[in-house]
Regions:
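Long, contiguous binding/interaction regions
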Residues: 2-152
């Protein structure tokens, strides 16, 4: 779901606590400014069966302006992955080639590691992670999903 809110201190905490107080898990949460000053957009991914109840509770919050349940058929979603992979002289070329073929950007390469950045759907990031797993993932982090509707 996408939530348009006033960009005020404590809004994120109130939204997150409203969801967690009801016993719902937040699978992904991303917040950022919009093209309208003083407004932020939250993209929250939670269990499907809880969306209607969550929307009702969030609509009661003062700083919430609009809530949209995103239709997967009419939504573009994206997230970013940073992943640090173990490499050596024998594997460096292979790892970098696989990353390039996957559309990842090489951010840093050291003697025994390489860091890549990939932007894409959750499925694409998971596929890339599985591709590099045999080489040894040292560290990785993913942002929360962001999404925008393609049709109004």
């Amino acid at each position: 779901m996408s939530i348009l809110v006033e960009d005020k201190p404590g809004v994120l905490a109130r939204v997150a606590s409203t969801i967690s107080r009801r016993g719902f898990n937040i699978n992904s949460l991303a917040v950022g400014p919009t093209n309208v000053e003083g407004r932020s957009k939250m993209t929250i991914v939670t269990e499907l069966e809880s969306v209607e109840q969550v929307k009702k509770q969030l609509n009661k919050l003062v700083n919430v302006i609009k809530i949209v349940e995103l239709d997967p058929e009419n939504t573009i979603e994206s997230e970013v992955l940073l992943i640090k992979v173990s490499i050596n002289k024998e594997t460096q070329t292979s790892v970098i080639e696989k990353a390039n073929l996957s559309g990842a950007k090489s951010v840093d390469v050291g003697q025994d590691y390489a860091v890549f950045e990939l932007t894409g759907t959750s499925k694409e990031l998971i596929k890339f992670e599985k591709l590099l797993k045999p080489y040894g993932i040292i560290e990785m982090i993913r942002t929360g999903r962001i999404a925008i509707q393609t049709k109004l």
